[in-house]
Amino acid sequence: MLVVEGLTCRFGNHAAVDNASFAIERGSFIGVIGRSGAGKSTLLRMLNRLAEPSEGRILFEGIDVTALQGRELRQWRARSAMIFQQFNLVGRLDVLTNVLMGRLAHMPAWRSLAQAWPEKDRALAMSALDQFDMAPFAAQRADQLSGGQQQRVAIARALVQQPDIVLSDEPIASLDPRNTKIVMDALLRINKHFGITVICNLHSLDLARVYCDRLIGMAAGRVVFDGAPAELTDRVARELYDLEANDVMGADHHAPVVPTLPALPAYAQAVATG
């Protein structure tokens, strides 16, 4: 279980996240919703320790994540994989090498420096790419891919980390509706097939309702809603977005979305087990 207790992050006199508290069961798909500037990205970055909390604690299975340093902190970042809005791929490198970067925390330093990837890691990376129909692009430069393809590569990279948690920060913000569905289905797949907890920042309430088990709503850095998607009423939407409910609930501009979970190849379970 992931437990957040009174988590606060201040930049000067401004609290980007203010006294956030919640607990998340293993295997959940959590949507963090709210308008721009609500503190969603800062919250996810604190969970991974890319941003340092000013106050509060993060506990995972009894471990105080906020106290980790050095090697233990690097291990935590491997266990809590980040997926960014802008993909964070190395454009000049091929797709397979970008995915293999997710294995760096599992390798000795000399292998990392030489990029001497073990054959089992290469097989793991190819298996991850195959989950998202990206294996045919393994030898292609990452900067030659479309935005949706790059995001699928980023998800494959996160998967080969063999994480306990995937933290996805606005993964569909720059994607068209078709690629939005492909990427959200990919996140749902790693959640349902591999039992990995997914915490995903989303602007789209429609998508949040369809894909997520639970929603955490933020406004001005504070958690103002925590519940099932069915509990997200028009009144709550107005509080979260400071807009008329009709504007919020109808602003996604996506056709109705139905999640798709294609069957996995039998060998794909290697991604989960190593």
UniProtKB/Swiss-Prot annotation:
Which Pfam family is one of those matched by this entry? Answer: ABC_tran
Record-annotated residues binding ATP? 34-41
Q: What is its EC number?
A: 7.3.2.2
Q: How does it sit in the bilayer?
A: Peripheral membrane protein
Reaction(s) this enzyme catalyzes, per UniProt = phosphonate(out) + ATP + H2O = phosphonate(in) + ADP + phosphate + H(+)
Domain ABC transporter: start-end pairs: 2-245
- Record bears the keyword Cell inner membrane: yes
- Give start-end ranges for the coiled-coil region(s): none
Q: Which GO terms describe its cellular component?
A: plasma membrane
Q: Name one GO molecular function term.
A: ATP binding
Per the record, the major location class is membrane
Per the record, the similarity remark reads: Belongs to the ABC transporter superfamily. Phosphonates importer (TC 3.A.1.9.1) family.
* PANTHER family, per the entry: AMINO ACID IMPORT ATP-BINDING PROTEIN, PHOSPHONATES IMPORT ATP-BINDING PROTEIN PHNC
Quaternary structure note: The complex is composed of two ATP-binding proteins (PhnC), two transmembrane proteins (PhnE) and a solute-binding protein (PhnD).
Name listed for the protein in its UniProt record: Phosphonates import ATP-binding protein PhnC 2
Species name for this entry? Answer: Rhodopseudomonas palustris (strain HaA2)
Q: What is the lineage of its organism?
A: Bacteria, Pseudomonadati, Pseudomonadota, Alphaproteobacteria, Hyphomicrobiales
